[in-house]
């Protein structure tokens, strides 16, 4: 690494960005069961199991309310076809609440397969690192003391922007994982709503929202792949321009590309919901 402070400051900011981007790539290929050593998952599974008892109680409640609202009289309940329909609904809902964890993990694995297919098709095993062009390093190192004073301000502002954007992006990806845990933990309660016809929309909305959270990973991967292609073709540097202008134009274009990626990651949930009509 160069001994120049300006170059070091910019390179450190880019290293932070690259490390966070690599961390995102690693997180998106992980399962909730193995995330952070699996300790969080064990607690979530215990909470899920504890809430199953409440889910069974709500299942009976939703079932009774559904029967009362959908049947005009007790005579309708005694009809074989109607009684069979009610029994099948109750049995299916009981199975969904009992095996809700397996159902949700199966859905997650299916969508994770979509993410893996996108990675393999694009030929990306990891993200492309963003590096400082040699032209800028040489130009900055050739600067005198007074010429480098404006560069300090430019690199401080640019480095701060890049660092803040990297943390905003990684927080969004961690937020997705936390939502996966939240959905998994409370799953027995909304899934029990399938027992009654009037309340079944609660369960449908829950499963749609969970699928949308899972699909966010595929959108983030696509955004990272597009950014990596941008990073492989760095901004054009004009060697005849002043050093401050050269560095400022490079940082400005780089931050713009980063803003596009951060915006895509931050709005991945909204994009998925618009695609799925949620």
What are these regions (language model features)?
Residues 1-10, 80-100, 203-213:
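Alpha-helical transmembrane segments and their helix-start/interface "positive-inside/aromatic belt" motifs
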Residues 1-58:
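Binding/recognition "hotspot" determinant
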Residues 23-26, 82-89, 109, 116, ...:
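Short amphipathic alpha-helical coupling elements at transmembrane boundaries
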Residues 44-52, 84-88, 92, 141, ...:
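Alpha-helical membrane-interface segments at transmembrane helix boundaries
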Residues 53-65, 157-163, 180:
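Hydrophobic alpha-helical transmembrane segments
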Residues 58-94, 186-200:
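Hydrophobic transmembrane alpha-helix segments characteristic of membrane transport
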Residues 94-186, 220, 224-277:
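Non-cytosolic segments of integral membrane proteins
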Residues 191-208, 240, 271-275:
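Alpha-helical transmembrane segments
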């Amino acid at each position: 690494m160069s001994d120049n402070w300006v170059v070091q400051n910019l390179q450190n900011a880019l290293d932070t960005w690259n490390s966070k981007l690599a961390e995102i790539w690693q997180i998106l290929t992980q399962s909730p069961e193995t995330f952070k050593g699996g300790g969080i998952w064990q607690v979530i599974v215990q909470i899920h199991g504890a809430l199953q008892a409440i889910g069974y109680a709500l299942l009976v409640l939703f079932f009774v309310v559904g029967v009362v609202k959908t049947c005009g009289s007790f005579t309708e309940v005694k009809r074989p076809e109607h009684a069979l329909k009610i029994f099948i609904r109750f049995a299916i809902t009981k199975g969904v609440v009992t095996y809700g964890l397996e159902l949700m993990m199966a859905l997650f694995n299916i969508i994770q397969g979509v993410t893996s297919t996108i990675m393999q098709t694009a030929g990306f095993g990891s993200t492309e690192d963003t590096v400082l062009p040699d032209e800028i390093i040489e130009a900055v190192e050739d600067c005198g003391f007074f010429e480098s004073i404006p560069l300090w301000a430019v690199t401080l502002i640019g480095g701060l922007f890049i660092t803040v954007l990297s943390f905003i992006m990684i927080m969004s990806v961690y937020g997705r994982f936390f939502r996966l845990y939240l959905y998994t933990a409370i799953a027995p309660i909304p899934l029990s709503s399938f027992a009654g016809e009037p309340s079944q929309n609660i369960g449908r909305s829950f499963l749609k929202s969970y699928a949308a959270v899972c699909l966010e990973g595929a959108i983030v991967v696509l955004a990272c792949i597009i950014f990596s292609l941008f990073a492989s073709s760095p901004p054009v540097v004009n060697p005849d321009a002043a050093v401050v202008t050269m560095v400022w134009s490079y940082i400005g274009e780089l931050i713009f590309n980063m803003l596009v990626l951060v915006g895509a990651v931050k709005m991945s949930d909204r994009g998925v919901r618009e695609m799925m009509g949620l």
